[in-house]
Amino acid sequence: MPFQNEIILVASVFAFFGGLVAFFRFFGKQGIFTWTVICTIAANIEVLILVHAFGLDTTLGNVIFASSFLATDIMSEIFGKKEANRCVKIGILANITFILISQSWFLYIPADGDTMAGPIRTVFANTPRVMLASLFAYAVCEMFDVWAYHAWWKWTEKKFGDKRKFLWLRNNGSTLVSQLINVVVFNLLAFAGVFPWNTIGEILIFGYGIFIVTSLMDTPFVYLARRIAEKHPELVKE
């Protein structure tokens, strides 16, 4: 099918963002925590897959990882800074747990008739440098995202005297900068000295381009989540 990868990537944005909001609608705060764990683990696996889309080769994982920023922004908007930071800590712990479990598989000696140990090792035997770079970048950019969201919120409320308005500004103002930090920190820590600097530059530009699009596209979903919370106050009182 022509443009199959492009179609799937665009559709996945709506699927992942919509899925997160659905988790919130049916399970409240716990649904957002659960989604954070799911997207953290899935992104670690997806990032190993290289696809050709929009004229360039790129790794998967960017879109579902972007939904983790939507999760913290929804948590900030509805439940506050403390719960948003808790969401980030759950994501960090899920990341560490997945890395430790997946690496422990390689301590076993496969049976003579085993046919899966080799492929599994190929998939999950990431270099420690890449795994640590991913974990560090996630922790830094997500914590910054929560801080920036509430910094923007405090500024707009003080300047305009309205706490409810300018959701779009605090959402995009925090996420766009956080995603830039994520792209720069991860790629420099993971690939400096591995790839030529011009290649790293291309990865940075294309990766951040994807995050700009997903960051702008997630704004309606924050509004939708807030609307759901207003119509269903029991989700907030849990």
Predicted regions and their residues:
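Small-residue-rich segments of transmembrane alpha-helices in multi-pass membrane proteins
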Residues: 36-48, 91-103, 177-179
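Hydrophobic transmembrane alpha-helices
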Residues: 1-75, 82
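Transmembrane alpha-helix boundary signature
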Residues: 45-56, 78, 100-113
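Alpha-helical transmembrane segments and their cytosolic interface
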Residues: 1, 5, 17, 150, ...
